[in-house]
Amino acid sequence: MRIIKLLLLVCVIFLQMGCSKTEVTILMPRTASTRVIYAGGQLKDALAGFGYDPVVVTDSLQSTKVIGQDKGICISLLQASDTTGLKKEGFTITSDGNLIRVVGNDGTGVIYGCREIIDRLEANEGSFDLPATFTDAPEMVLRGGCVGIQKMEYLPGRGVYEYPYTPENFPWFYDKAQWIDYLDMLVENRMNSLYLWNGHPFASLVRLKDYPFAVEVDDETFKKNEDMFLFLTTEAEKRGIFVIQMFYNILLSKPFADHYGLKTQDRNRPITPLVSDYTRKSVAAFIEKYPNVGLLVCLGEAMDTYEDDVEWFTKTIIPGVKDGLKALGRTDEPPVLVRAHDTDSKMVMDAALPLYKNLYTMHKYNGESLTTYQPRGPWAKIHTDLSSLGSIHISNVHILANLEPWRWGSPDFVQQTVNAMHDVHGANALHLYPQASYWDWPYTADKLSDGKREKQLYRDWIWYKTWGRYAWNCRRDRTDEINYWNNQFAGFYGTSDGDGAAIRMAYEESGEIAPKLLRRFGITEGNRQTLLLGMFMSQLVNPYKYTIYPGFYESCGPEGEKLIEYVEKEWKKQPHVGELPLDIVAQVAVHGDKAVDAIDRVAPKVKENQEEFLRLQNDMHCYREFAYFFNKKVHAAQHVLNYQWGKDMAELDAAVPLLEESLVYYRRLVELTKDTYLYANSMQTAQRRIPIGGDNGKNKTWAEMLVHYENELANFKANIATLKAKTAGEFIEEDKQITAMTPAQVTLITPLKSVRLQVGASIYSDRDVKVQALAPELEGLTAYVMSSARQRAEGTAIEFEAKEPVSLLVGYFRDDQTKYAKAPKLETDASANDYKQAEAKLT
């Protein structure tokens, strides 16, 4: 208490001597930590902005000699000397006349206490209006944003996630002023962690004595990277922000892989002593060199089995961390975070906790989209299983594929979502992706008239503010929150609070559209689908054909029915259950109307950030046109499904005007976006398949998609005409001869016996099984006789040479058996379409 008493003495002397009303003295101990000093600096700058004349002094005796004025305000910044029973990062503010005291439970608590004062000054137009006592602390332990050090397309000669840290690849990474803005934004929103995502960062940041050739950057760039990481961690530390580096497994440095004749990543590669040693030493070197940087471990997307995940984590990653700590002489255990993606995280944690105690777990909230604040099902169970382990469990708001690219920021949706994270999943930490354009950081998809690029931090301020506010405390009164957000929007756009309410309403109404549509009609929540480009009739009529991601419908929304299920129940006169598809498309149309009405009503009254408001207004109109487009198309799909059940041609005829009307809305959408957006989806690789392939950055705009939808309508009309002609006996159907594929000319290096593929052929050397039937396209191709036992034990490898490109067909079983390899899934294997293998060629 000595420090507190001394500071109070200084303040009393200060008040007795008097000072100007506009002068504020900020007092802090001479031994103040970097975080307290930062807090004082932030408070000083804010006070100056409100017209005060602030000065920062320490608690030396000389301080009393420089304060002598008439009247003033004294704010003392302290850290609690006894933290027993106090929550980390919490604070208490006491106010007695002109004497204000901020006592943080730790240095970060002082920062947040000062932020509380700043927030109240902003809300009260610069006047101090503080309660006698105010105490607060965060609910969530970690609250952080992530930045992807990744790009929208692959680098030449490299695979997914393989992006060395270089000025050529990421010029923004070396912009220190931009990082300061980001870190200060995190503080403003009371976030305490920064996640950097990259496939294999080690080869850009550390040198290994045993593998000096593994470094992927030149010496000059390596020094720049060292400087940037030192700068970033130093600036983050003074703000109470924990920097965490994410990496995928098993990924190798390209020069390392080339040196040993390996692939940088191979999902079917077994763990070998070489790749384990390299990775273990990389992790150790990183921990030793950057002791204040945590690790987020993704045991995928290039690992073979769950058993491999356990072995890799317990025998490579954790030993690497311990090696680095040992080199530093540290006996503590810094946090290591484990993603529950493409792995059995419970199995991993059960094996790892006896070896390393300070483990956190992380799992995606709604997969790679935002669909509901009512999560349930098998994915919710993954969360509850992990949160029950006793360690901190992090909810990962990931990618947001269904929200790209338009503005989204519904405070009500976010608050209910964070409540669900706590109450349904048992999570106590937040990991937050950008709202859109993750792969294009720091830019948005907006096309500006001057050719410049808009920054995400400016456009999506509401995204970070909502999540930060509710990660701190989600148990806030709804009425109070409505007033709070009305004021926030009013402040940003220069309107009254009443008009700010209209902007909030536009955000909250539009904020229901994409979540509702994806959870009721989507094929997947993942990057594979870009919802806001639309869907084809075939995808609405039979989503199963496009491989619905398992668990998606059971987990990412309230119980309900797909359109195909709804129509079947209608025909069978069965009762419906839960959320229904036709209700949803009706609701989103209403949401769109309300959003547009609200935003248009306030447009003439906006005085600040007017150009940004026009972009927001345009987005609301985009949402409305999309909602109506989708509504009409779903009703058309309903008629097609009715035809499949009743064979009534009138159903198909009824679908035509609905499809035509859907295109009217889509053409309006093209007009709204052609001069305002560069793209819809920021991942512009072969991973994007729904509504159509996005290879090489194609089919990423609404204008491109309009051509496909117009062709779809033309084909639909032609097919109806053909059906009618057949019914009338006016159509002469020609038998089409199915031509067998031509065998490729290859030179086989692997010694295998060949056999002509036909009914009765034997294709296993150790099993008495024969081909019973096959597609005519495959008749006469060359098959190779394999050992079933060897395939199971060692996998399958066929080495051959070809003088020209050839196609290799791989067959997969439809059922869920485990005897054979499963068809590739882009949701868990980003390399699943590197050879165009993600889509069926013959079914």
Which ranges hold each PLM region?
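Sec-dependent N-terminal signal peptides
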Residues: 4-15
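Feature activates predominantly on carbohydrate-active enzymes
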Residues: 22-25, 31, 39-42, 46, ...
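Acidic, contiguous N-terminal accessory segments
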Residues: 9, 19-97, 130, 764-770
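Extracellular and analogous surface-interaction loops
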Residues: 787-790, 796-807
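Catalytic-core regions of glycoside hydrolase
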Residues: 63, 124, 172, 192, ...
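C-terminal non-catalytic alpha-helical accessory regions
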Residues: 159-160, 434, 453-701, 712, ...
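Glycan-recognition and processing domains
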Residues: 736-792
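Polybasic, proline/glycine-rich intrinsically disordered low-complexity segments
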Residues: 677-702, 750-754, 758-760, 818-843
